[in-house]
Amino acid sequence: MRFAASIAVALPVIGAASAQGFPPPVEGVTVVKSKFDENVKITYKENDICETTEGVRSFTGHVHLPPDDNDFGVYRNYSINTFFWFFEAREDPKNAPLSIWLNGGPGSSSMIGLFQENGPCWINDDSKSTTNNTFSWNNKVNMLYIDQPNQVGFSYDELTNITYSTINDTVYVADFSNGVPAQNLSTLVGTGSSQNPWATANNTVNAARSIWHFAQVWFQEFPEHKPNNNKISIWTESYGGRYGPSFASYFQEQNEKIKNHTITEEGEMHILNLDTLGIINGCIDLMFQAESYAEFPYNNTYGITAYTKEKYDAIIHDIHRPDGCFDKLAKCREAAKEGDPHFYSNNATVNAICADASSSCDNYLMDPYQETNLGYYDIAHPLQDPFPPPFYKGFLSQSSVLSDMGSPVNFTQYAQAVGKSFHGVGDYARPDVRGFTGDIAYLLESGVKVALVYGDRDYICNWIGGEQVSLGLNYTGTAEFHRAGYADVKVNSSYVGGLVRQHGNFSFTRVFEAGHEVPGYQPETSLKIFERIMFNKDIATGELDIAQKPDYGTTGTESTFQVKNEIPPSPEPTCYLLSADGTCTQEQLKAIKEGTAVVENYIIKSPAASKGDPPPTTTTSPTAAPTAGSAMLQAPVAMLAISVLTALAFFL
């Protein structure tokens, strides 16, 4: 049964979750049963929902894995149905490399990256139509967007009736045996996952194990992708600063086990030929990045003084004092090393110590920032931030779109079950077996390219902390990387998009005028960086072949801090029904709850919100210093009018 609403718009799918009523029946999907395991299958549909370029194919589908009582030592009594969206390259897909894209969270859907950052289309402000993205990452690369771990986005364990509150951005399991409640502005109904935190991966390494199983099935048995180029890259963002190193190193370790015949099971012996790991605004390791949560709001290149000297000093003290953040992190890591060396998160004592470390550091580092009323993902924007636009949530709520996708579930941008599961074991406080910086070093030693790319307006995983990670790596090229200077990233004949330090296969780039979701702010710059890395060109100019010059290093200044930025105009406020918790004022939320809000295409027209105050700045003008690039965003016109801060799950 499907329901419609009797307001100014048809009520959508569950927004930060999902549901325009229930999805239509799944029809017309192709089913491929595994030749290795009768209980494994792939279901998919070809469609042109987002990629409309003539002759360029795209597919949505699921890889279905049954419960497993010995998943590399982890008992898993739930099914995994992992959603993917595959776009062939617009140019020569048969010979193009492939990149996986993963958003972070933990628990955030990769549809964020697809529709707000680097996919083939932008969603217009009617939440129904699309505009071609000329800077799409599938221009020359086959792109595979994956919703993971289980229950994220369109991925699910078991189909479950749910309701969704637009007011507090929460999904609830529902019992509709006595009838389905009518939908209204504040309550939507639909189909989702079980919401059971025990029915998903509970840490980064277990997520790596699951995604490796997905990859074994997809790359061997998905019939629509049979390339001549077998190179695979992973690009990720935010909490992907942990996903990326862990997943890529796990893939590489499994490759070694396949080669030395440690792994001999049929169907699990496909080599995943890793080429590149790219991390955008990654939260990688708190030991390297913790101090940046005090430094960035206090002293940044935009002259925004969100913190006083007293607040800055207090946070630094909480990091270093006895039983402070660093002490708790060290205790967690020592306990994990002794009590859970394989990262199964099945030791209650270790979980409790690490959960305490994670929550304590979060309190010390991030709670003070809430008082600033500035954006977590863009320090130059207000907390209720409408950029990048959330229009894709309404787009994915359309019955026609869900039908074309062949999805049995409504869209869920953030999986609460995943967040609970990861936070409950203190995943963010502890590294994996090698450590995430150790993983990056291992990948570099294995010949894998690694690129760290950071927008310079993001607070939550800011570039100052990212730079510290880059300088803290210990690998054979460490000294040469440190000696390299920062060079301009030349995007075109008239625009410099950032500064890069690069030596050989490793690079750190600061992208000007960009928040957390860098490609959403600077599509052209991001595409240039992405393609240069993918095709072995130097990031600064794109003219040198790094494969032929393995000792190449950039020259320039030791720091980038001398390059200052102008504060951009604050975006016009836009209250979007499906992102109400992150874009609407208290007055607007009240009107939504009472059913008095005037809504058009999911946008609250009345009551209207007023633009907030500009961020606080220093009294010293930075005009004497060089100015970064141009203050104008490169985002297309269709995106400039309205945008969104997705609800602060943890990281996107």
UniProtKB/Swiss-Prot annotation:
Record keywords, A-Z: Carboxypeptidase, Cell membrane, Disulfide bond, Glycoprotein, GPI-anchor, Hydrolase, Lipoprotein, Membrane, Protease, Signal, Virulence
InterPro entries with a match to the protein in the record: AB_hydrolase_fold (IPR029058), Peptidase_S10 (IPR001563), Ser_caboxypep_ser_AS (IPR018202)
GO terms under cellular component: fungal-type vacuole; plasma membrane; side of membrane
GO molecular function: serine-type carboxypeptidase activity
S-S bridge residues: 50-121, 325-361, 332-354
Glycosylation sites: 77, 132, 161, 168, 184, 202, 260, 299, 347, 410, 474, 492, 505
Pfam families per record: Peptidase_S10 (PF00450)
Pro-sequence residue ranges: 630-652
Gene Ontology terms describing biological process: proteolysis
Record-listed E.C. numbers: 3.4.16.6
Comp. bias intervals (Low complexity): 618-627
Residues the entry annotates as binding substrate: 461, 517
Domain of life: Eukaryota
Signal peptide (from-to): 1-19
Catalysis: reaction(s): Preferential release of a C-terminal arginine or lysine residue
Database matches in Gene3D superfamilies: 1.10.287.410, alpha/beta hydrolase
Lipid bilayer topology: Lipid-anchor; GPI-anchor
Region (Disordered): 607-627
UniProt-annotated location(s): Cell membrane
Positions of the catalytic residues: 238, 458, 516
Lipidation (GPI-anchor amidated glycine): 629
Role of this protein: Extracellular serine carboxypeptidase that contributes to pathogenicity.
Similarity field: Belongs to the peptidase S10 family.
Stored PANTHER family: CARBOXYPEPTIDASE (PTHR11802:SF189), SERINE PROTEASE FAMILY S10 SERINE CARBOXYPEPTIDASE (PTHR11802)
Name assigned to this protein: Carboxypeptidase S1 homolog A
Taxonomic lineage from the root: Eukaryota, Fungi, Dikarya, Ascomycota, Pezizomycotina
